[in-house]
């Protein structure tokens, strides 16, 4: 895999607060190699390591996108939800930003059935057929459609398991991460100072609580995906 330049600079990361970890009492000792200092009871993340692993992740997603691979971005906590959706839409990736439904990947046949139901209901609504049903039936199906839109809206065009999964918060999305590990799907994970760096294929040490930090990391990754997609289209 060729290494590329992704314009990752430490000053920009500091401004976004990428270096702020959790309180020193709330940490995982396995994160020690990624911590550079303690300040006012908070662990400070070594941004040189962040830049290195973010660059590696950008190389990986560029390479995958240039070969037409599919991505899923997962981040369901309130602080991450909007950034996840906008980043995914920009790079034409699938995403989950509300709630991870257990078995979404490991029980793919059930997810696929739900997606078919979702697509059918959307088509029925677009053609106005739901409005011609008895009031009670129409209300029930509209509620069902709203529920499916909330939880499956970001993966409505997904036709199979993703090739790479990007996870915004390891602890919050632990179920999703375990499903990827079970299925052997490569993962890229933002890891704060309370996380386990050994669980993902590429772990990017970063503040996973600040919106600016999450947005910066996702922006770099989706820029690399977009470049890779352009390369794929040119070479087809």
Swiss-Prot record:
Pfam short name (any one): Ribosomal_S2
GO (cellular component) term, any one: chloroplast
GO process terms (BP): translation
Coiled-coil ranges per UniProt: none
Localization per record: Plastid, Chloroplast
Ribosomal protein recorded as keyword: yes
GO terms for MF: structural constituent of ribosome
Keywords, alphabetical: Chloroplast, Plastid, Ribonucleoprotein, Ribosomal protein
CDD domains (UniProt xref): RPS2
PANTHER family to which the protein is assigned, alphabetical: 30S RIBOSOMAL PROTEIN S2 PROKARYOTIC AND ORGANELLAR, SMALL RIBOSOMAL SUBUNIT PROTEIN US2M
Database matches in NCBIfam families: rpsB_bact
Protein family (similarity comment): Belongs to the universal ribosomal protein uS2 family.
Name by which UniProt lists this protein: Small ribosomal subunit protein uS2c
């Amino acid at each position: 895999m060729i290494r590329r330049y992704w314009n990752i600079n430490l000053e920009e990361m500091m401004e976004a607060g990428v270096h702020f970890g959790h309180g020193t009492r709330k940490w995982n000792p396995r994160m020690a190699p990624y911590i550079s200092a303690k300040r006012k009871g908070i662990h400070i993340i070594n941004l040189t390591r962040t830049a290195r692993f973010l660059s590696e992740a950008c190389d990986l997603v560029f390479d995958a996108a240039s070969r037409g691979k599919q991505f899923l971005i997962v981040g369901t906590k309130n602080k991450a939800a909007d950034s996840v959706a906008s980043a995914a839409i920009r790079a034409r990736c699938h995403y989950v930003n509300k709630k991870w439904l257990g078995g979404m990947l490991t029980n793919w046949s059930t997810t696929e059935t739900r997606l078919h139901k979702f697509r059918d209901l959307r088509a029925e609504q677009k053609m106005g057929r739901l409005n011609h049903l008895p009031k009670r039936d129409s209300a029930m199906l509209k509620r069902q459609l709203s529920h499916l839109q909330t939880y499956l809206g970001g993966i409505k065009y997904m036709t199979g398991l993703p090739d790479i999964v990007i996870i915004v918060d390891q602890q919050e999305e632990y179920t999703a991460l375990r499903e990827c590990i079970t299925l052997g799907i490569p993962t890229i994970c933002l890891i704060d100072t309370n996380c386990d760096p050994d669980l993902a294929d590429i772990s990017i040490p970063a503040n996973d609580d600040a919106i600016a930090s999450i947005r910066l990391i996702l922006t770099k990754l989706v820029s690399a995906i977009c470049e890779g997609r352009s390369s794929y289209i040119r070479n087809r």
